[in-house]
Amino acid sequence: MRVAVTGGTGFIGRYLLRELLGQGYEVNAWFRHEESRTGILEHPKLHWVKGCLEDAGSIPLLLENCDAVVHNALWRPGNTFRGTEGDLAKYTQINLGGSLSLMEIAAKRQVDRFVYVSTCAVHEKIMDDRPLDETHPLWPFSHYGAHKAAVEKFVHSFAFGHQFPVCAIRPSGVYGVSHRISASKYYDLIGAIARGEDVECKRGGKEVHAADVARGITYLIAAPRDAILGEAFNCYDRYVSEIEVARIARDLSGSRSNITGVEKSPKHEIDTTKLRRLGMNFGGEEQLRKTVKDLFEAVVNPSATRSIQ
């Protein structure tokens, strides 16, 4: 089976490439420029296709001989997902318009599976009288979340109206060792602990490891058609408080850092029953501890060579 991947050179995308190739899939992957592929090892089943959301002409090449598509790409002018959308008309034209072009061409080619990587930011205004599951209303605060919610509506129309086997996965906040190590979530906090500095921990968030997102996507590729048709799937592991990360790092390092702050907890937990029913499980505390250990080692030995693939 051959899978077309957009956004394969990014943070989640690199974990996805490794997971797909590790499971024996052939992969066609978009890349924007040569520098974006830095650190990704060559693989006989990995086929690069130059292209991007702005270049509709590259879509047929990406989809050539493919049985499935994972759409993970996002065009953004800033370094963060929210608040750096820039010109909203351009942002929407590229991301929404490009996503629809990709979906439409894939549907015309009768691709067997299309997985859209959405986000849990589609529901940021949360109601207290119901579970935070996939039936919860989509009320985003950001334009980023709004465009993801808009694409999800076309997931419904393509699936329910045209019987195209498309679905969406909604990762929460995502952590893990990034190919740009210093950009990894918790890197600065762990670095401060490694240096023996005192830290004050104030934040926490709903998190899932990038490797778990990648595995979740493969479950959606392999699931029966009727189980995914037009559906969205929450992808979330656990709430991670900064003070928990700091304490793990201190235990690993033997640091004398003084850690202050309180253990944060979520007001609403995200329900992941649907994805778990397909066989998915998450890395939990063990995955978190391994990631903190890997980041700590990167801080103390920054010259070590690492590759996501």
Pin down the residues of each PLM region.
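N-terminal Rossmann-fold cofactor-binding loop
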Residues: 30-35, 52-53
